[in-house]
Amino acid sequence: MPPRIIILGAGIIGLSTAVELQQRHQHRSAEPRPSITIVSAELPSQPSEWTEDPRCRPSPDYASMWAGAHYRPIPGATPQLQREAQWAMDTFRRMRRIARDAPEAGVRMMPGIEYLEDSPKEYGRLRTGDRYAGEHDEFRVLDKAELPEGVAWGCRYQTYSLNAPHYSRWLLDRFLAGGGQIVHRKLERLEEAFTLFEDGSQPLVINCTGRNFDQDDKMRIIRGQTVLVRNQFDRTITRQNRDGSWIFLIPRPFAGTIIGGTKEPGDMEVKPRMETRLKLLENCVRAFPEFVDRLEDFDVVLDNVGRRPWRDGGLRLEEERIEDGKTVIHAYGAGGRGYELSWGIAKEVADLVLATERSKFECRVSENLK
């Protein structure tokens, strides 16, 4: 019987991890390839399905379906941010390859522009030609003459933007085409994963649930609301206001542009607020008139509300041994950076999985030689 891996959650971390594990095992011949199963209460779907059948509409807790999503680097000012910066650059490298080799995936390379009304010291140290998003990112600090009124610092670089529901579905299709299995089921506790299959196997469980079944005191919910419009744009722009709020444009390949956004800690409201939509559109007209300069010119498609699973101290990524020799690898709590960090996290999870498998394989060989 091949070893069994169970991945809990079909968000961007779970999907990326599943595909990464499949690809890594293709190059290993000394050990049997594992059976990989994703167990999730919800699965990726397209917005066109949401309008045709409301039952297909994702819940706000399935945050990966409601994401922008683009890559905006954050300088590594703390050990956790330095770790995330490496994951982000690993992801940038992979996304660039996907954009080149699989245009149907919904990932597109484009210019990224940032404007900061305040300039933290970690940004002030950056110089044109530095590596910001990743290798060959054409990073350039903007001259003062290029900055809008009220902006203290700005930059331009090459980044990616993606269509979150489309890309997630593309990943799921790749996983299934590679022999992966799906169990469409909601679990109440992590321990249930070990009894899903009655074949006597001892699965390795990877916890990509986002919130860890609400069993982690460090977890917080941050509500985000954005607006999807049909209006098209050719670059992604982010402006950080002096009060810490943000205004951003995220082109969505095949489907318009995302305008955002909000960060509302502890707010569990699932319905979009119309006053928030109006404020987002007004802010966009004021900050980015080169995109749309009149409210009446917006062609609104959809309001997005997602509840981001944010964790104090950063995402939890570690192996845990629990009773009876059971192994869990945790990878949850990425907050609003799931897509930006996805392939870097998946790579590190896969490293842990392969190390665990290697150890078990060597133990079996040793036992057989006795």
Curated annotation (Swiss-Prot):
Q: Could you list this entry's UniProt keywords, alphabetically sorted.
A: FAD, Flavoprotein, Glycoprotein, Oxidoreductase, Signal
Q: Which residues bind FAD?
A: 13, 42, 63-64, 68, 308, 338-339
With respect to pH, the record says:
Optimum pH is 8.
Segments traversing the membrane: none
Enzyme class, top EC level, equals oxidoreductase
Which family does the record claim for this protein? Answer: Belongs to the DAMOX/DASOX family.
Family matches, as PANTHER family: D-AMINO ACID OXIDASE (PTHR11530), FAD DEPENDENT OXIDOREDUCTASE SUPERFAMILY (AFU_ORTHOLOGUE AFUA_5G13940) (PTHR11530:SF26)
Q: Name the chain's protein.
A: D-aspartate oxidase
Q: Give me the gene this protein comes from.
A: DDO
